[in-house]
Amino acid sequence: MRGKGVPVRLDKVSFSYGEAPLTFDVAFAAAEITAIMGPSGSGKSTLLNLVAGFETPQSGGVLIGGVDVGAAPPAARPVSMVFQENNLFAHLSVEQNVGLGRSPSLRLTEVDREAIDGALARTGLGGKEKRLPRELSGGERQRVALARVLVRDRPVLLLDEPFASLGPALRDDMLDLVAGVHAERGMTVLFVTHQPQDARRIGRNVVFLDNGTVAATGSADDFFAGAGPEAFRRYIGASAGNAVSQDIARKRT
């Protein structure tokens, strides 16, 4: 499954860490960007891990493109994921870290190398192919992680607060890069964020989690216009819905 985004559904999924049960029954629209928000401990990262295959539901099903992927290991699922920790290999160069998205053994064909060069250029890393991760800034390391996603070319992209450690300007740059890539490739993007500004900047939809379940879903415009549940308004704060200027560069498709 490659190319344009596909729908993602968690169908009556239950999961628990010890005494904390989580239940997810939610659908994510194909080829759209959905912000997943909620208090700490509400299950945001767990939801992404269930989609990616890093966690296994105790009941219910995970469907990607209408196919139940419960039996598929993470590597076989049509998803890519970027974490807050960029998961780069310190001893590998930029181009090698990106190349892992094409071949875990780094046995690369000419087509693979062309894809890597294109991804590095698209993410602003041209000319830095031979550098090691320690020679890069935090924002550049996350660009490497995103370039690796591009060469994998999966229809679903999962973002688990990958830019949370960056300053506001760098974070905006990375969000705009994600929005630009989404506009070009049309993948389904699920991204976890605590930042209302981030959700408003690129999110078309919002899924709000509270107490280990899906408390509400809807369009980002409606949520930030006050139509979200009271728990969401408390979560973002009374003035956060108006914190982002109305003339912000919206990068949606």
UniProtKB/Swiss-Prot annotation:
InterPro entries in the record: AAA+_ATPase (IPR003593), ABC_SmlMolc_Importer (IPR050093), ABC_transporter-like_ATP-bd (IPR003439), ABC_transporter-like_CS (IPR017871), P-loop_NTPase (IPR027417), Thiamine_ABC_ThiQ (IPR005968)
Molecular function via GO: ABC-type thiamine transporter activity; ATP binding; ATP hydrolysis activity
SUPFAM superfamilies assigned to the protein according to its UniProt record, in alphabetical order: P-loop containing nucleoside triphosphate hydrolases (SSF52540)
Top EC class for this record: translocase
Topological category with respect to the lipid bilayer: Peripheral membrane protein
Residues annotated as binding ATP: 38-45
Reactions mediated catalytically: thiamine(out) + ATP + H2O = thiamine(in) + ADP + phosphate + H(+)
Residues covered by the ABC transporter domain: 8-236
Keywords attached to this entry: ATP-binding, Cell inner membrane, Cell membrane, Membrane, Nucleotide-binding, Translocase, Transport
UniProt xrefs under Pfam families: ABC_tran
Signal peptide from the UniProt entry: none
Subcellular location as annotated: Cell inner membrane
Its EC number(s): 7.6.2.15
GO cellular component assignments: plasma membrane
Principal location class: membrane
Family to which this protein belongs: Belongs to the ABC transporter superfamily. Thiamine importer (TC 3.A.1.19.1) family.
Subunit structure: The complex is composed of two ATP-binding proteins (ThiQ), two transmembrane proteins (ThiP) and a solute-binding protein (ThiB).
Biological role: Part of the ABC transporter complex ThiBPQ involved in thiamine import. Responsible for energy coupling to the transport system.
This protein's name: Thiamine import ATP-binding protein ThiQ
Originating organism: Mesorhizobium japonicum (strain LMG 29417 / CECT 9101 / MAFF 303099)
